[in-house]
């Protein structure tokens, strides 16, 4: 074998070694990228489950406030409830600490259309001389009137609102009365937070004269005289929960029924291009179906401190070059 042939064979060997090394390095980097993505997706899924549970628990917390209001009203008696009693009861609760996110707690009374004049006389004599019934849409049916709510300072605009004058609120109230269970409205715009469209809810608990929930049927309609309720603004409800806006993008939508999804909350302002991958969960919360769409942002992946496919490829390429040069 002459020198030229030997050099040619060595050159071919070096080229083959380099090519094989680069191929293996590329395959290794590609495989690592797949593993990293799978692990990152699993991490997002775990985080999404935790956050969905936190959101659900936060909303479920408000039922205890509703029970407290209901108990105070039943103790006083349907005909003896007055503004001062309701105010004094509210002073026994630290709403912002006990029920973070609730704007307050109130009482909604059923008022037959024929009894409206008498109800207004009683309400005005009860320390509210300017009390009047407000309707979002005129109607001739039974009124469901917000008679009391505390603290008044941040909810005064809601006093006198007939929630039966708007379909979303009315349907939730009817569902609560008929099922005997707590119910949420779909996304609404609170009259006391009108600048935030479809970002709020009412949570309602039915109150029956007997103090217990009657068996299913007409007895519930006969005994139900109102609801304890709380207005909820989504941003305030979620405040304080461990949702890192810089790492996770969250979109909440109401997907109850057959209609289109109604988005009611988005955290942050991450552009679609920043959302690397996502995970969607659905939860039933007091008669509503919520969709929770979580997306991982670059910071979420960075915090996982995963090995870099790029560094693996560069290291493999360097080793391949060294081997080829031997």
Give the predicted meaning of each segment:
Residues 10, 21-86, 92-102:
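Juxtamembrane extracytoplasmic/periplasmic/luminal helical "stalk" adjacent to the first N-terminal
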Residues 10-14, 126, 140, 305:
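Intrinsically disordered, low-complexity regulatory regions flanking sensor or DNA-binding modules
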Residues 44-49, 74-295:
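Intrinsically disordered, low-complexity polar/acidic regions
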